[in-house]
């Protein structure tokens, strides 16, 4: 199964997991969003965490998401993006 099929097949489960953590507006960016992903590419997620979300909760969500999908993932929030990359990420981000 390629990376795009994996994402599609796990979409409902990802949304349930996100709901448990209060995560909203889940988008994908990076090589997967640009359709340039390779067999070992990770999946970059852009999300909105609830106000006051701790770094530990962020890390727990990322770990559980990676385990669910069976691939390395990176999870970023819009607020956590560096100013230099924010515009590019926002332009290429696509809804899950």
Each predicted region: which residue ranges?
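Basic nucleic-acid-binding interfaces
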Residues: 15, 19, 53, 94
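Short hydrophobic/aromatic patches at helix-to-coil boundaries
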Residues: 88-96
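Conserved strand-to-helix beginnings and helix N-cap segments that scaffold or border functional pockets
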Residues: 11, 40, 58-59, 86
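Catalytic metal-binding acidic patch
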Residues: 30, 35-54
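Metal-dependent nucleotidyltransferase catalytic core
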Residues: 1-4, 10, 49-81
